[in-house]
Amino acid sequence: MAKITLDEAKKEAASLRTKLDEWADAYYSKDAPEVEDNVYDQSYNRLLELEKAFPEIVTPDSITQRVGGEIDSDFTKVNHPIPMLSMGDVFSKDELKEFDQRMQKLVGHPVEYNVELKIDGLSLSLEYQDGKLVRASTRGNGYIGEDVTANARYIADIPQVLPEPLTIEVRGECYMGKEAFAKLNQEREDEGLSVFANPRNAAAGSLRQLDPKVTKKRQLSTFIYTWVNPPREITSQHQAIERMHELGFHTNETGRKLANLDEVFDFIDEYTAKRNSLTYGIDGIVLKVDDLSLEQQLGNTVKVPRWEIAYKFPPEEQETIVRDIVWTVGRTGVVTPTAVMDPVQLAGTTVARASLHNPDYLNEKGVRIGDTVKLHKAGDIIPEISEVVLSKRPADSVPYEIPTTCPSCGQKLVHLEDEVALRCINPSCPAQVEEGIIHFASRPAMNIAGLGPKIVKQLIAKDLVHNVADLYHLTEDDLAQLDHFKEKSINNLLTAIDNSKKNSVELLITGLGIDHVGAKAARLIAQKFKNLEKIMSLGVQDIASIDTIGMTTAESMTTYFAQPEAQKLIEELRESGLNMDYLGADEPEEAPDNPFKDKTVVLTGKLEHYTRSEFTKKLQALGAKVTGSVSHKTDYVIYGKDAGSKYNKAEQLGVPLLTEEEAIAQIE
């Protein structure tokens, strides 16, 4: 590491922790990664490097000192008496040699390993009593996970009853196969929903569903690889896996016991070549000391077991030539460039296009038509240009010129302040109209069954609709003009359109596609102000007064409703008979005055008088907002026994600390 002062190390480490916390929250808790794995890994390893060089800068809440992400408050919490720790990562064979040397030094002799494929999914614990499945839970933060038993019962390869009346806990990986992932994303795209970035996030989003029927539809699978506290007769990893397979668990047939590191390297080479032909995603291999007694001897660090390591595959790259750069217009008018390239085989699929995101990104990469570029798949799924091979750039190459007019309607593009994107601000732009209608009809919005992208394209091409209000004037004769649209389809679509008139107003607000106003914000605003006429008259501060609604959302909403075009559209929808009122449950009665009303509270440690869920509900009934992490916005931290990093962070930030008993005394 280059020379660096203590102050410089503190500053860089603090910046890295902030970024890594945000990325980890997006990955673990929201199932929506914001950066590629290798970017996260590089930043994480840099933080480790700094903390190793300057131990005094390590903080209790550093991501290097904990496992996984925050716990979702919608699920019942599950304690893991034996923590579900994450694994250390290495990225080269030299680092694996160092791991092997470390193992031999610690145990005093050569070590045999059990190797497994590193499945790209999420960790899952299964508990059985007398042979019956009684609980399934996620890893969560390693010590407390989420109860997903109801959902796990819909995963076909999880045994509900074992052939023997055993009381055991096993652990493994829940994943989504490549075929199921492709099918799910195609369905979501057809319905106008955002697609999942990779199978891991699709699996996590599918398992962590409040509605088990959604999980059932998603075709999840498992590989089980750990028996927690196995019986004495089981003395090795490979023996435990064989026995779990006999009990009916789905284990990975590729795992094997290997005598030395040379055999491990052969295994890595074999599956580096085979990975794209597998029916499920892998991102490396896992190396475990096979002898369970040695595992006990080696133990764990605070964060990872000493006896296992994950070797991560490097991203696969291919070279290809950029033949064109095309621009497409989205629902909100954002114009996005895409590189069109000579097709290449990459990570198991043919790739011919890659997003260039925005003009700044395009200029930063320096991509030109005719350039040879290196291409990889972010998360093994999303094609992305890594770099331009400048040594192969044609002699007559010229810099690419960013367009100034919309590719759909020809009007001038604008660059709004504080945005990197180019926008078309013509509300009649055909491309925006098409995307807007697709969004309006999608499941999170008006949920008009049968009105997918292909039908919308035809309606616009045949000049039958120009905005969402026109949908409510469609007739049987209009729909009969569409290709392959018969009487049954016509009747079904007209019925679905008519039924959508009865939707609660928050679905209409969502369907309008207002920038920064998603389904959750729309519901909160509708719940508070009850009808669209009232909402359209609100000022920025009125909307921003709602907890969790920020100024950006409030400003965007008031700006939208101030436009004459928007007001005209709402009036047309009203005249067509659309409901303009909130039909959902009323807001809970206002809580009486108490010390926790309108306060942000964090619970930590083991509570004795209430379960975590019970105390959370009690505080929420008193008007408190209960969150999972401590920050400057936290008003109180209530702690029980064995309180950990949240307690320490509260002390650092000066957040008031209350014991469970002190908190109860203030509310009872």
Swiss-Prot record:
PROSITE patterns from the UniProt entry: BRCT, DNA_LIGASE_N1, DNA_LIGASE_N2
List of catalytic residues: K118 (n6-amp-lysine intermediate)
Coiled coil: none
Cellular component GO terms, alphabetical: cytosol
The entry's keywords: DNA damage, DNA repair, DNA replication, Ligase, Magnesium, Manganese, Metal-binding, NAD, Zinc
Any one Gene Ontology molecular-function term assigned to this protein's record: metal ion binding
UniProt: NAD(+) binding residues: D37, N38, V39, Y40, D41, S86, M87, E116, R139, E173, K288, K312
GO annotation (BP), single: DNA replication
CDD domains: BRCT_DNA_ligase_like, LIGANc
Cofactor(s) the protein requires to work: Mg(2+); Mn(2+)
Binding residue positions for Zn(2+): C406, C409, C424, C429
Domain BRCT: 591-668
EC category name: ligase
Keyword Acetylation in annotation: no
The family this protein is said to belong to: Belongs to the NAD-dependent DNA ligase family. LigA subfamily.
PANTHER family xrefs: CHROMOSOME TRANSMISSION FIDELITY FACTOR 18, DNA LIGASE
Matches recorded under NCBIfam families: dnlj, PRK07956.1
Name under which the protein is recorded: DNA ligase
